[in-house]
């Protein structure tokens, strides 16, 4: 049964869905990392695919840019298609000099200037956090591949073009490991519907130094992040979580 934004049928999605912002990155992941991948949805060109990774059924689908967009897709995947785990695999900006372009960061929590979780939580602060066991599995996956990851809080911004750049200094002071636009919303939706979620991001640009990757690199590379996400699913299965 299709939803207003996803034209897949029940059973088309695996219980775990990797979600990049860019639907073309979803296509890239399906074509380069999954076996026997089949496209299951394409409404508004927000492509979704299901295949297998080392024999394990896994899906991948884009979620668009910003909390409103990703919240729609994550809600429908969990509520209507029975998805149990969401792994965001996206890009982020760095504000700390100790974090470099192309580093991989894991968001154990996500701060935000959005009010969406306050709306959900009756105007109280909600601690938007990842599932602990998913964080643990991702760390183990990175260690097994010899990839150094930074674990900490993300900041999910409402505005890409911020009118107050001084906020980046505050984020740096508070130890923010990456600035992006979705994790806090995804964690909020997962909590609302009793699912689990994790955001793994690759640093695409450094807000303070100006170093950045190209749009083509963001679409077609960042393979370490994808491998960590996929391996973490297998580790979670083996450990019973």
From Swiss-Prot:
Query: Record's GO cellular component, any one?
Result: cytosol
Q: Where is this site: Important for catalytic activity?
A: 218
Q: Which GO terms describe its molecular function?
A: purine-nucleoside phosphorylase activity
**Which top class of enzyme applies to this chain?**
transferase
- Name the UniProt key words of this record, in alphabetical order: Glycosyltransferase, Transferase
Binding residues for phosphate: 21, 25, 44, 88-91
What's the Enzyme Commission number for this chain? 2.4.2.1
**What domain of life?**
Bacteria
The catalytic activity, as recorded, is: a purine D-ribonucleoside + phosphate = a purine nucleobase + alpha-D-ribose 1-phosphate; a purine 2'-deoxy-D-ribonucleoside + phosphate = a purine nucleobase + 2-deoxy-alpha-D-ribose 1-phosphate
Where does the UniProt annotation place the signal sequence? none
Q: List residues binding a purine D-ribonucleoside.
A: 5, 180-182, 204-205
Q: Which GO terms describe its biological process?
A: purine nucleoside catabolic process
- Described purpose of this protein according to its UniProt entry: Catalyzes the reversible phosphorolytic breakdown of the N-glycosidic bond in the beta-(deoxy)ribonucleoside molecules, with the formation of the corresponding free purine bases and pentose-1-phosphate.
Q: How does it assemble?
A: Homohexamer; trimer of homodimers.
- List the NCBIfam families hit by this protein, alphabetically: deoD, PRK05819.1, PRK13374.1
Name the record gives this protein: Purine nucleoside phosphorylase DeoD-type 1
Organism, by scientific name, is: Vibrio cholerae serotype O1 (strain ATCC 39315 / El Tor Inaba N16961)
- Gene (UniProt): deoD1
């Amino acid at each position: 049964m299709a939803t207003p934004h996803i034209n897949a049928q029940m059973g088309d999605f695996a219980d775990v869905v990797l979600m990049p912002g860019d639907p073309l990155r979803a296509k890239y992941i399906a074509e380069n990392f999954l076996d026997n991948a089949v496209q299951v949805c394409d409404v508004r060109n927000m492509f979704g695919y299901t295949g297998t990774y080392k024999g394990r059924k896994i899906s991948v689908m884009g979620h668009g840019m910003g909390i409103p967009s990703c919240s729609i897709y994550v809600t429908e995947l969990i509520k209507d298609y029975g998805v149990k785990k969401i792994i965001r695999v996206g890009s982020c900006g760095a504000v700390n000099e100790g974090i470099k372009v192309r580093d991989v960061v894991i968001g154990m929590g996500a701060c935000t200037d959005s009010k969406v979780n306050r709306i959900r939580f009756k105007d109280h602060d909600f601690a938007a956090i990842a599932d602990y066991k998913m964080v643990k599995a991702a760390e183990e996956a990175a260690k097994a591949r010899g990839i150094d990851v930074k674990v900490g809080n993300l900041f999910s911004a409402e505005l890409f073009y911020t009118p107050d750049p001084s906020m980046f200094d505050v984020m740096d002071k508070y130890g923010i490991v990456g600035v992006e636009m979705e994790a806090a919303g995804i964690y909020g939706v997962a909590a609302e519907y009793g699912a689990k979620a994790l955001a793994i991001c690759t640093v695409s640009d450094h807000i303070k130094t100006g170093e950045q990757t190209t749009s083509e690199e963001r679409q077609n590379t960042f393979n370490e992040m994808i491998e960590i996400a996929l391996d973490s699913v297998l580790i979670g299965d083996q450990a019973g979580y």
